[in-house]
Amino acid sequence: ALWKTLLKNVGKAAGKAALNAVTDMVNQ
């Protein structure tokens, strides 16, 4: 279903953003 693909993509993007935020915090 289209919404499942959409949900998966949103989850991937959110995970990547969270990972980047954590990396930024560690680097500061």
From Swiss-Prot:
Tissue: Expressed by the skin glands.
Secreted keyword on record: yes
InterPro entries per UniProt: Dermaseptin_dom
GO cellular component, one term: extracellular region
Pfam families, A to Z: DD_K (PF12121)
GO term, biological process aspect, one: defense response to bacterium
Cellular compartments annotated: Secreted
Keywords of the record: Amphibian defense peptide, Antibiotic, Antimicrobial, Secreted
Family: Belongs to the frog skin active peptide (FSAP) family. Dermaseptin subfamily.
The protein's role, per its UniProt record: Has antibacterial activity against the Gram-positive bacteria S.aureus and E.faecalis, and the Gram-negative bacteria P.aeruginosa and E.coli. Has antiprotozoal activity against T.cruzi. Has antifungal activity against the yeasts C.tropicalis (MIC=10.9 uM), C.guilliermondii (MIC=21.8 uM), C.albicans (MIC=21.8 uM) and C.albicans ATCC 1023 (MIC=10.9 uM). Decreases viability of murine peritoneal cells. Fuses to, and disrupts liposomes.
Name of protein: Dermaseptin-DI2
Organism field: Phyllomedusa distincta
